[in-house]
């Protein structure tokens, strides 16, 4: 599904977020393959955060004391002019990415953006590209969209050890009871397995077996996602059509129309996101907090609202 080699994949437990946390934690306490010292012994550590983005990503790096640097998102992915300038600083240790159907904008990184990311030459020898491919097969409008393999792209530019890719079946089988994985170079795999071998004996092999028997292969898994799409598309259509009918004529907000992923990203007139969500709560609708999609939970424009339509029935959404 990721397009990489079997030897580059480590299958874990139910949560890719745990694998992401562990990767940053190991870099902090032990360093990575090319670290001169553990990150905890660096005088200053900074992290690039394409924004709006995933609040749990930001919380991980915030919890380890990183200075979080906001990178504006464009229609093609993070603003790479800004990224390429910032990575000249050796204290910049990594960058979060949700490259396909980004959380929350639903943006797919362009081939050019992926090329520029894969060919980066950071000043930090242990710069860590965290590639959270959470929605790699999560189209709900149209067919599966093939996506470049970031591992081979990085290898092409001499950066094989720069990237760790993550994915899970949380939105394929059962959230909280699926399986997750990370993918990386063989050299990184050898290094990480030595550390993981001290931490754990194994993950839930029976659950891994259940998933192999149920998902079977790529073709069968994509067919399953088509069934998910039948459930999800009417919900997203309901949200977008309501916004277009009720809000568009007023000219007080803009939004993205994603073809996959799990969110609709709405931008209100600046200064109104918190007030809008307060009114929603008074009406009995609780949504993701305003500012959650920004580092430190602070949206300087107080504008972005993340709408997640997947849970309620269409009738409730309406």
What kind of feature is each model-predicted range?
Residues 1-125, 136-157:
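Conserved core of the PLP fold type I
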Residues 12, 152-233:
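Conserved core segment of the aminotransferase class I/II
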Residues 32-35, 159, 282, 296-318:
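PLP-dependent enzyme catalytic core of the Aspartate aminotransferase-like
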Residues 94, 128-129, 164:
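Hydrophobic "anchor" residues on beta-strands that sit immediately upstream
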Residues 132:
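Glycine-centered flexible beta-alpha turn that most often forms the glycine-rich phosphate-binding loop
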Residues 188-189, 193, 263-306:
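Conserved C-terminal alpha-helix-loop-beta "cap" of PLP-dependent enzymes
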Residues 226-240, 252-267:
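Conserved glycine-rich beta-strand-loop-beta hairpin in the small C-terminal domain of fold type I
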């Amino acid at each position: 599904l990721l397009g990489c080699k079997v030897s580059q994949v480590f299958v874990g437990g139910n949560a890719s977020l745990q694998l992401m946390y562990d990767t940053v934690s190991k870099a902090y306490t032990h360093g990575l393959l090319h670290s001169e010292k553990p990150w905890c012994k660096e005088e200053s550590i900074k992290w690039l955060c394409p924004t709006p983005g995933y609040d749990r990503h930001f919380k991980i790096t915030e919890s380890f004391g990183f200075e979080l640097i906001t990178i504006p998102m464009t229609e093609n992915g993070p603003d790479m002019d800004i990224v390429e300038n910032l990575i000249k600083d050796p204290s910049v240790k990594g960058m979060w990415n949700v490259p396909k159907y980004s959380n929350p904008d639903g943006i797919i990184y362009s081939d050019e953006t992926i090329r520029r990311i894969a060919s980066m030459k950071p000043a930090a020898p242990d710069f860590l590209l965290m590639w959270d491919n959470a929605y790699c097969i999560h189209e709900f409008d149209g067919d599966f969209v093939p996506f470049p393999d970031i591992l081979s792209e990085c290898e092409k530019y001499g950066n094989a050890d720069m990237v760790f890719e993550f994915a899970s079946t949380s939105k394929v089988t059962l959230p909280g009871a699926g399986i997750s994985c990370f993918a990386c170079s063989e050299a990184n795999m050898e290094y990480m397995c030595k550390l993981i071998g001290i931490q754990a004996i194994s993950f839930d092999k029976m659950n891994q077996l259940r998933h192999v028997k149920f998902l079977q292969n790529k073709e069968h898994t994509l067919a399953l996602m088509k069934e998910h799409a039948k459930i999800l598309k009417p919900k997203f259509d309901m949200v977008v059509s309501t916004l277009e009918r009720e809000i568009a004529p007023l000219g007080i907000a803009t939004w993205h129309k994603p073809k996959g992923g799990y969110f609709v990203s709405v931008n209100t007139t600046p200064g109104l996101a918190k007030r809008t969500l307060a009114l929603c709560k008074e009406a009995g609708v609780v949504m993701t907090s305003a500012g959650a999609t920004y580092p430190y939970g602070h949206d300087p424009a107080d504008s972005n609202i993340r709408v997640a339509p997947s849970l309620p029935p269409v009738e409730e959404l309406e």
